[in-house]
Amino acid sequence: MLCKFVMKEKIQNHNITKMIEDKILIKEILPYLSMSKDSELDLLETVKACFYRLKTGCQWREIPVKQFISRAGTTWNTLYYHFNKWCKNGSWLKAYAALLKKYQRYLDMSCVNLDGSHSKVFTACQSAAYNGRKRYRSTNLLFLVDNQGVILCCSMPVSGEHHDLYEITTHFDEILEMLEQAGLSLKYIFMNADAGFDSTEFRTY
């Protein structure tokens, strides 16, 4: 009974409708995602379940499927299948690029800031390794934000034993490619970065 109560409270506290309204998901996200014609799942319900997982950080198997999916018999495996498919075919990326392009007038591109962020890793996962300086296993990402701190893009994750300059030109190319899809250019824009990015290779990039 206690477990059921805790789960119920957790679901209520992380109500997906409090994060993003259905009409916004339908208008801004769903046009870039698709399912097979034979699928009996509702696209909106599936996306909301995926967003719940991203918001709470829970394991896929811990998603309260019945809370989001009306089709009986649906499992977390099915939700993961669609989420993973949209990741691999670039659907999520297209949706995000479209959002950046549509609302770029709200961005402050007078200056952009580049920085790396290490996230502590507790379980086995891809792109994670022991970081001797921080003394824990971590994964590292490079983030580019506008002058307001709004995230514009991030690189693919690398294992935590690498510093911010590891394959910097490759990762910065990823960021530039994403921004180009959104119709944003860093040409003639001042970019601020800390001393960890100071290298001849990056200066002459």
Residues covered by each model-derived region:
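Short alpha-helical elements
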Residues: 1-205
